[in-house]
Amino acid sequence: MGGEGDSSQPQSGEGEAVAVNIRCSNGTKFSVKTSLDSTVESFKELVAQSSDVPANQQRLIYKGRILKDDQTLLSYGLQADHTIHMVRGSAPSSAPPPAPAASQTTAPSVTRGVGSDNSSNLGGASPGESLFPGLGFNPLGGGNAMSGLFGAGLPDLVQTQQQLAQNPNMIRDMMNTPAIQNLMNNPEFMRSMIMNNPQMRELVDRNPELGHVLNDPSILRQTLEAARNPELMREMMRNTDRAMSNIESMPEGFNMLRRMYENVQEPLMNATTMSGNAGNNTGSNPFAALLGNQGVTTQGSDASNNSSTPNAGTGTIPNANPLPNPWGATGGQTTAPGRTNVGGDARSPGLGGLGGLGSLGGLGGLGMLGADSPLGATPDASQLSQLLQNPAISQMMQSVFSNPQYMNQLMSLNPQLRSMLDSNPQLREMMQNPDFLRQFSSPEMMQQMMTLQQSLSQNRNTASQDAGQTGAATGNNGGLDLLMNMFGSLGAGGLSGTNQSNVPPEERYATQLQQLQEMGFYDRAENIRALLATNGNVNAAVERLLGSIGQ
């Protein structure tokens, strides 16, 4: 044992060797001496010398968390004579790590002034694998605009698109997260989201076959896959053009396409680019952003041409504008400089057809709130307390906060937050501490911070009204707004779209069961009992399973 401890001493360079207990899944126990400053990867090598489990098959679990190779033992709060549970997992497949988000500066093509509410048009991006990239495509606005997974204060969507091009695995990792899987495999939730829009509801009532398409989870997967893979996107465009050409060459084919345009595509465009009397609020029209900036383009042109404004509001005149490419980035922002983008409409050029997927009003289960949210980007305390109980959101947050690399990439995406952290090294160090992040993201702490933010927001509104200047008092608490928008909205979702009480536990906890099996827990019945007892929380289930071993 002493030799093993000595072998880890030169690597850490500081700290003395301490004894750490290892408990295997078969109930056996042994001790290993190592430095707490050593990495988990080197610690696994030491454990492999005292056990028959290779380092690449070890799954080390401490306090319900799986230790990651690139982290130090001290970062997990490990101390002398503490016990680490070890289970044997399958040998991991060799895969290159995800490329870091390579965008330390803002995109030169996007220049926006920092005003009293410059959170408008700032979308979210996925900083790494399993980070629930917030659908990285949420156009955000101040006031009553829809909030996204990470709230306001993250980079522009053009920058997001550039990063996704450099790291195409982001969307793939996002699709593997429990929250996204729950969304795409929940037809009832998708149906309720679609039916929340009166125009879409009327369109689906007239065309039942369209409802089947919109409720098909495979459509979402195909859309996300096309957005992730440029080659697949171009192939789908070619196939669509070829199919349209073939239909047009058939007898009565042109009339068929014309009827499809009049009965389906034009109403769909109207439903996604207009919101009736709601002031073009994306909160009242959850599908307003699916086609990027098409609505902004038409309304921007209408603002300059008063004769066409009444027709645009009624929707009775056929659309004479060319339809946008639903798989490509829209060019609607060409007319955007001519109009003031206030909270009611904060859509940005999207990532292809997913341009505003983050602002869908029905995506409450993914961290978005309704348009009646008082702060626009964070929920109230009672809502947060309820939604944070969702195991998928808890797992997502723990995945984010347990890896400082995610936080570094996330913080580097926003110029304002990055400059604030650069000017305060102590704050940056705190934001890179996993223990602090987990404590900061606890429901109790977030409720206290939200209460403080609400008080500051009310004081700011009062001061701005007294001074006659909008946002006159935003400068002092802008950093708090950024941090709370980033942390508060991370947990502001509960996947509570439908009641899952009648869903069998094998289906309800399919993702969690797969995770437990990958960790080395192969007793499916015992895993289901543990998940039922912990309401689907994988970490708590692991603690329960490990506690029952050897007893």
From Swiss-Prot:
Residues 294-319 have a biased composition (Polar residues). Residues 88-127, 294-336, 455-475 are annotated as: Disordered. CDD domains: UBA_PLICs, Ubl_Dsk2p_like. The keyword Cytoplasm applies. Its main location: nucleus. Residues 18-93 form the Ubiquitin-like domain. Keywords: Cytoplasm, Nucleus, Repeat. GO terms for molecular function: polyubiquitin modification-dependent protein binding. Residues 504-548 form the UBA domain. Residues 465-475 have a biased composition (Low complexity). Transmembrane segments: none annotated. Residues 143-184, 197-236, 373-410, 414-449 form the STI1 domain. Changing residue 61 to A: Strongly reduces interaction with RPN10. Ubiquitous. One of its GO terms (cellular component) is nucleus. InterPro entries: STI1_HS-bd, UBA, UBA-like_sf, Ubiquilin, Ubiquitin-like_dom, Ubiquitin-like_domsf. It is found in: Nucleus; Cytoplasm. Binds and presumably selects ubiquitin-conjugates for destruction. Prefers multiubiquitin chains rather than single ubiquitins, with a binding affinity for 'Lys-48'-linked ubiquitin chains. Acts as a ubiquitin receptor that associates with the 26S proteasomal docking subunit RPN10 for the indirect recognition of ubiquitinated substrates of ubiquitin/26S proteasome-mediated proteolysis (UPP). Interacts with 'Lys-48'-linked polyubiquitin chains via its UBA domain. Interacts with RPN10 via its ubiquitin-like domain. Interacts with PEX2 and PEX12. This is Ubiquitin domain-containing protein DSK2b.
